[in-house]
């Protein structure tokens, strides 16, 4: 399945999602690896097998095996970090902020792709997963590395569109009213 076939599966109530998917498919504001790694990481974070398969297939001709693994690692490591750091951020007890995380996350230091690509993918996944602490941390790293606010906003926009496609597919599976 590709982005085009994914668009074809979306019902009429998701027309805006279909149009937005077309927009990101044609968007060339990001470098190829940055864009397709971002889309794959976000698709995996959506936890929808059809969306993940569509974006994995779409990314196949645009990513090296190392970049594909890095995108998968971004979704995976943020799946862990977003839960932990969202808890730390939201818990009323300030003691949790002082405790060591004791979580292995070596891939962040050595992702196998340029640091800014990986950080952008982590930021987008963190937006999907709703971790404000991680969003702030990754946004700061990106800003300090000279990544523009427009690029950061584009990544989060792409994340929102991918997530909405997953929700639309799931909503379409609800049985019809009798």
From Swiss-Prot:
Coiled coil: none annotated. Its EC number is 1.11.1.28. It catalyses: N(6)-[(R)-dihydrolipoyl]-L-lysyl-[lipoyl-carrier protein] + a hydroperoxide = N(6)-[(R)-lipoyl]-L-lysyl-[lipoyl-carrier protein] + an alcohol + H2O. One of its GO terms (molecular function) is disulfide oxidoreductase activity. Belongs to the AhpD family. Antioxidant protein with alkyl hydroperoxidase activity. Required for the reduction of the AhpC active site cysteine residues and for the regeneration of the AhpC enzyme activity. HAMAP family: AhpD. PANTHER family: ALKYL HYDROPEROXIDE REDUCTASE AHPD. NCBIfam families: ahpD, ahpD_dom. This is Alkyl hydroperoxide reductase AhpD. It comes from Methylocella silvestris (strain DSM 15510 / CIP 108128 / LMG 27833 / NCIMB 13906 / BL2).
């Amino acid at each position: 399945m590709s982005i085009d076939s994914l668009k074809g599966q979306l019902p009429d109530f998701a027309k805006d999602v279909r149009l937005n998917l077309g927009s990101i498919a044609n968007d060339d504001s990001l470098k190829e690896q940055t864009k397709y790694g971002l889309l794959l990481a976000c698709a995996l974070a959506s936890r929808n097998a059809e969306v993940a398969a569509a974006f994995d297939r779409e990314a196949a001709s645009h990513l090296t095996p190392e970049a594909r693994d890095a995108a998968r690692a971004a979704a995976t490591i943020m799946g862990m970090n977003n839960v932990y750091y969202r808890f730390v951020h939201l818990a009323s007890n300030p003691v949790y902020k002082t405790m060591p995380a004791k979580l292995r996350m070596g891939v962040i230091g050595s992702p196998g792709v340029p640091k800014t690509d990986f950080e952008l993918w982590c930021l987008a996944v963190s937006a999907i997963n709703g971790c404000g602490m991680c969003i702030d941390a990754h946004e700061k790293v990106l800003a300090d590395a000279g990544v523009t606010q427009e690029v950061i906003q584009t990544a989060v926009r792409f994340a929102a569109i991918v997530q909405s496609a997953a929700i639309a597919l799931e909503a379409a599976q609800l049985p019809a009213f009798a």
